[in-house]
């Protein structure tokens, strides 16, 4: 007697899907289908599955039939349960903790996905399929893989014995259409006055460092800043995993290469930075500076390659410059700390700190100017800040972007480059009517000081 089956993760649904899957494997020579186009092979299997479902006599709606057929096709040709998540353009991250615990990130907030794998072996098979398609392998001798899918998505996989609870998979999806500065303004990540300053900074060939934590939106902002580079300039991009989507015509994209199975052939970012200097670049854009390449990047900025852009993992502008100092020491060059700080202060013009707030929104926290040196200390001044006022009833972070009232020294360089900013852009004028009554009752968050030394604790 036929029983009603809801197409979900129930045992009855999984049993039916497994039975149909086994029958397809038994009745079709899948190897013979490999030479066919995927559309042709999928159509043949879809027809077979439809006939099999008719024979099963299971009462199912047309939508349920379509879902179960698609699910089996995903198992045969795609990445199994991950396929609908990969196809959903509203999802930015897919995080597989265990075979039955899969989370997604949508609009900066994590949610349970509702999908699951049959068991650890099923998850391991999908991971192996993913990494093998990009020419990589994962096994006990090489239990970690960091790779890029053909569509640009970043994949990180780790398996036992390093992953204690079973195979783990993280996918950072690649946006087909890069966000623009208008998008960031609409999302509340930055304001139009800040965009004007950043556009002018790029045109005037200021060296810009973007700082933030994981998932804060560093690459997104770097992509936006890179879009401001004039189209008649030659750009060389250097990335560990290619994510930038530059629209200019004259772009050379470089990407690091991991070692092969024999442990040979590794090419790191430092080698690419050094090589890029021989490629007659007008601009060098480093996706993220992580190690010894920091010294070569700083030297490039100080020797005629103005207008370079990069990002770094750090929690504040001060930490960002301190991290650069640490990374320079990884190069093996024994330079005095004061000499390294002089290199940094003369190379970096602007530091942008961004963060992901508790409500999932990504915002620019500070736009700071590197002023110079006082003794052996780098000094900075904040030009724009995001002033947090508290948390609203709906969990949204309340706050506003405002200038600090300090006119940056780099405005002279902008004027020389033909960039004229509106008068009063840097004046700190309180919002009309002052702070809203509701906001005054919320807990306040201290605003960072306007000028901060780098090289000693505040």
Predicted regions and their residues:
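N-terminal anchoring/assembly modules that precede and organize ATP-driven motor systems
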Residues: 1-111
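Active-site phosphate-binding and catalytic loops of NTP-dependent enzymes
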Residues: 32-35, 55-62, 77-88, 130-147, ...
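P-loop NTP-binding catalytic core
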Residues: 88, 96, 101, 105-204, ...
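P-loop NTPase switch/communication element
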Residues: 175-186, 203, 223-274, 320-324
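Hydrophobic anchor at the beta1->P-loop junction of P-loop NTPases
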Residues: 210
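Conserved lysine of the Walker
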Residues: 218
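Conserved P-loop NTPase nucleotide-binding/switch module
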Residues: 239-252, 276-375
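NTP-binding/hydrolysis catalytic cores, primarily Walker-type P-loop NTPases
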Residues: 363-458
């Amino acid at each position: 007697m036929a029983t009603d089956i809801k197409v979900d993760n129930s045992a009855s649904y999984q049993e039916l899907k497994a039975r149909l899957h086994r029958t397809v494997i038994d009745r079709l020579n899948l190897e013979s289908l490999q030479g066919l186009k995927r559309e042709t092979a999928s159509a043949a299997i879809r027809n077979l599955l439809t006939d099999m479902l008719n024979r099963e006599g299971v009462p199912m709606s047309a939508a349920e039939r379509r879902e179960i057929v698609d699910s089996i096709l995903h198992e045969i040709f795609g990445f199994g349960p991950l396929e609908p998540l990969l196809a959903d353009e509203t999802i930015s991250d897919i995080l597989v903790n265990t075979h039955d615990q899969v989370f997604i990130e949508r609009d900066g907030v994590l949610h349970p996905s509702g999908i699951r794998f049959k068991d650890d072996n099923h998850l391991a098979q999908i991971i192996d399929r993913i990494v093998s398609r990009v020419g990589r392998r994962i096994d006990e001798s090489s239990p970690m893989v960091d790779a890029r899918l053909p569509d640009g998505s970043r994949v990180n996989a780790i398996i036992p014995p390093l992953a204690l609870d079973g195979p783990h998979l993280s996918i950072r999806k690649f946006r087909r259409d890069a966000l623009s500065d208008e998008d960031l303004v609409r999302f509340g990540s930055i304001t139009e006055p800040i965009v004007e300053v950043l556009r002018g900074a790029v045109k005037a060939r200021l060296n810009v460092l973007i700082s933030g934590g994981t998932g804060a939106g560093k690459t997104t902002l770097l992509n936006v800043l890179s879009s401001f580079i004039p189209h008649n300039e030659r750009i060389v991009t250097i990335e560990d995993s290619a994510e930038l989507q530059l629209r200019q015509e004259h772009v050379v994209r470089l990407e690091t290469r991991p070692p092969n199975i024999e442990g040979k052939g590794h090419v790191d970012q430092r080698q690419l930075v050094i090589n890029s200097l021989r490629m007659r670049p007008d601009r060098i854009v480093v996706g993220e500076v992580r190690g010894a390449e920091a010294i070569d990047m700083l030297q490039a900025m100080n020797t005629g390659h103005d207008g370079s852009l990069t990002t770094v993992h750090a929690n504040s502008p001060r930490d960002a410059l301190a991290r650069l100092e640490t990374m320079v020491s990884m190069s093996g060059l024994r330079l005095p700390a004061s000499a390294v700080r002089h290199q940094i202060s003369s190379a970096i013009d602007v530091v942008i700190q961004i963060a992901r707030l508790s409500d999932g929104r990504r915002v620019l926290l500070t736009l700071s100017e590197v002023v110079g040196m006082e003794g052996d200390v780098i000094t900075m001044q904040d030009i724009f800040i995001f002033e947090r006022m508290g948390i609203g009833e709906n969990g949204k972070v309340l706050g506003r972007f405002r200038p600090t009232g300090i006119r940056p020294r780099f405005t002279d360089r902008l004027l020389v480059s033909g960039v004229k900013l509106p008068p009063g852009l840097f004046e700190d004028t309180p919002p009309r009517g002052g702070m809203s009554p509701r906001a005054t009752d919320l807990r306040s968050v201290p605003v960072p000081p306007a000028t901060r030394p780098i090289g000693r604790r505040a």
